[in-house]
């Protein structure tokens, strides 16, 4: 499935070459941490594929911002909750790229607050479809484009290690991501492909909108050494570093980026 922006800009992007630049795909890049990551990678001169599910206007704005700064980007649409979503996104990425993908950031994810007593099966399955199945099979489908020096970054969460609130199902998906980081890093190391994870704490995004209130900030500060609310850029800069050559000797690690939460 392709978004309208991808269709309108793909031909123009094909006319450009980026032999010296890295190529990157960031899932869930229309807003939040994904948006900030796409912009950070573009500042490193990467050609960025901006994935979105339904937020076409927001994805278009990210692409426009990158292009206005002299960078290269296109938007790709895919519903990663669907069984064929990762395959569709990989197919669109292959069409947009020149046979090479250097950076994959599996950022797209959904969250849900529900107690063990109240979690519906359908919602549980959707959480695992988007947060675990999608990055697994997207990685599988894109591996033929990734060679030595490529980097994969999977998004985990502080919640995988630190029980907070009624997020057991969501936290379980992020625990699965932690496991995938280790296994992928071991399996792909012989190919020269690095795999790492980033585990944010509470970040000022739509997913954690409660921190935009005084009460929400106070709740966070009680658990956090650094007394401010994290912004998406705080996480994106770490992701961009892990994707860069500066992190060439780091693989299989999960970096906790949480301002010193629960030290």
Language-model-derived ranges and their functions:
Residues 105, 189, 194, 250-252:
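Short, small/polar-rich loop/turn modules that mediate ligand/substrate recognition or access, typified
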Residues 115-116, 120-128, 220:
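Substrate-binding pocket helix/loop in short-chain dehydrogenase/reductase
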Residues 139, 173, 181:
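Active-site helix of classical SDR
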Residues 157:
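Residue(s) in the substrate-gating loop at a strand-loop-helix junction
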Residues 144, 186-190, 248:
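Alpha-helical segment proximal to the catalytic Tyr-Lys
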Residues 30-31:
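Conserved glycine-rich cofactor-binding loop
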Residues 197, 219-250, 259:
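C-terminal helical subdomain
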């Amino acid at each position: 499935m392709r978004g309208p922006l991808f269709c309108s800009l793909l031909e123009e992007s094909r006319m450009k070459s980026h032999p010296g630049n890295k190529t990157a795909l960031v899932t869930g890049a229309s807003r939040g941490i994904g948006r900030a990551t796409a912009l950070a990678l573009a500042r490193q001169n990467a050609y960025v594929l901006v994935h979105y599910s339904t937020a076409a206007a927001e994805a278009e704005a990210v692409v426009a911002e990158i292009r206005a700064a002299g960078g290269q980007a296109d938007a790709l649409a895919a519903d990663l909750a669907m069984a064929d979503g990762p395959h569709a996104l990989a197919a669109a990425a292959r069409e947009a790229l020149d046979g090479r993908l250097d950076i994959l950031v599996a950022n797209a994810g959904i969250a849900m607050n529900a107690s063990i007593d109240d979690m519906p099966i359908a919602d549980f399955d959707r959480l695992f479809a988007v947060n675990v199945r999608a990055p697994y099979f997207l990685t599988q489908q894109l591996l033929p484009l990734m060679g030595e020096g490529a980097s994969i970054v999977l998004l985990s969460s502080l919640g995988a290690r630190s029980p907070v609130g009624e997020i057991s199902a969501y936290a379980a998906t992020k625990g699965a991501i932690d496991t995938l980081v280790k296994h992928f890093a071991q399996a792909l190391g012989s190919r020269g492909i690095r795999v790492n994870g980033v585990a944010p704490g509470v970040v000022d995004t739509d997913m954690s909108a409660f921190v935009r209130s005084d009460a929400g900030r106070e709740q966070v500060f009680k658990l956090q050494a650094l007394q401010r609310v994290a912004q998406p850029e705080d996480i994106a800069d770490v992701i961009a570093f892990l994707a860069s050559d500066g992190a060439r000797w780091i693989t299989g690690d999960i970096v906790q980026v949480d301002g010193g939460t629960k030290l």
